[in-house]
Amino acid sequence: IGSENLPGVRSYLHHQVLNAVSPEKAEIVERAGGFSAALTRRIMTGGIMEDGELIFSGDEDYDLIIDSCGLKGELPYLEDVTITDEFPAMVTRKLFTINCTQAMAAYIGYTKGCRFIHEAAMHPEVAPLIRKALAEAQAALKAEFPHHSEAIEKDAAEALSRIANVKLADTIRRVAKNPRRKLSSRERLVGAALLAERHKLPNDNLCIGIAAALAYDDVEDTHALGLRHDISFHGVDKILTEDCGLLPYDPLAKRIKGKWNSLVKSSSSHRYGAAAFNSKEW
């Protein structure tokens, strides 16, 4: 069972296992093995203790949701385990509520100099943008999955509770890392904005989050610096097309570019980081 924020994780895991074994064992795997996926939870690794044990912390979740597709045979009853045939919808819900909210907190929080996700969640200028973006994503999800409305409300409440969890001390750097991957058209920010666009619903605040992700420039993140380099030399339109899957003349692309331009112009030095954010210009 694969537990990773990766589209098609079940097929990916299947492929990786088959590539790692001999043809003879591959036949056994195909005959007897089942490949499935589970919803991921937020887990942060810490240091390694002297005895070799890994220290980690995570959200206080007690349920495990598993995709019924790909499982072979009947699983025994397991407490707090839910096996569902609506796994794709549940993944989308999680991505556009939990992960979207964390991304908004990380990228916009970074522009205000926040170091931790809970700081961004409590920041007077950042928190309203997070909540508005979540509301946009919620509306889009309810339009897409009307029979999931009550569950989507619970997802949204959980998302806000998670980012405010001081005990986890989750860092902006961890959540924001590799912004390029998270700007994909199927990912937490652009995907949510596209879903809202498809249902002709507002997505202005999601666009602010996307603009902040495009501007993320943590010097410790080589992916972020690579993104900034490409924007500097090739322009933001290239990134919107190749990474976000948007054509320059798409209304959504124009909206994102407008927010990004406001963010960049608000800094006299044209640095994209903390000094660049001015909420009044959004």
Predicted regions and their residues:
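Substrate/ligand-engaging "lid" and interaction regions
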Residues: 1-282
